[in-house]
Amino acid sequence: VYKRQDEINAVVLDPGASVIRGGWAGEDQPRAMLPSFYGWLPMTDEERNLYGTEGLKQEPGPTQDGDVSMNDVENHSKPPVPRGISFDASRARKRFLGDSGVSYWRRGLEIDTPFDENGIVQDFDSLHAMSRNVFDALCAEPTENPLLLTEPADNPRAARGKAAELAFEGLNVPAFYLANRTVLSAFSSGRPTALVVDVGASRVSAIPVVDGFVLRKGIHTQPNGGDAVSRALLWGLTHEMGDKNITGWLADSIVPQFLVKSKQPCDPGMPAKATLREDRLHSTTPSFRMYHTMQ
């Protein structure tokens, strides 16, 4: 499809239970792939006074290199908010978004996700902040680009309405379309009628598509996605499973990378020679440690 020079491309957002992907319509692959998780800390009293009433209407601030938008120049009452950070006034949370938001260790940092165990969005405020972060990664302005947002085949009606509210009232996009990702997968293979097997992080689904429409009564799902495989692997590494000859060794515990201060080489079959960060052992939250253990 040939495009005119003055034509504005649509932004495609594909939020999954593990990764949220963003890119431009017509391209073969996404431009941005960010984790569907975010870190959060309680807002300080100063942050509550400055940003406690902004909520969904918060404007994106400058980058870490100091670039400032015209909105920030005109508004001298509040300091700009760095990209990758947002504030949830309703729950008094300071969110840390993107790879750096969930990778950098901070004292007391919790890890959360807007999705439930079935991959359905439950927290649209957090999804709005993540969507803003994806637009920033694409160097795109939501008010100037149409948005195509994907949804699972069994997305409830209430979630569809919330998604439209997020697009028009939260992001202020000029045009919006909510597309079934199962139908998009079938169309990408040139088949309007297909049986799509979707293996995701939270579950595995077998979904029939006929002439571009999903047969909802024929959907079969199992909660045995990639996360379940990772949990089973973690259990197998830390628990004895009858015949030790199967694995040959048993791990006492899995130590995440953020707890390792330094390492030394050791011979095969010998215990690891690592120095841990003792100061982080008791100030790390269970959610942060589990997230990095499963990576």
Task: Go through each PLM region and give its residues.
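C-terminal region/appendage detector
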Residues: 3-197, 203-295
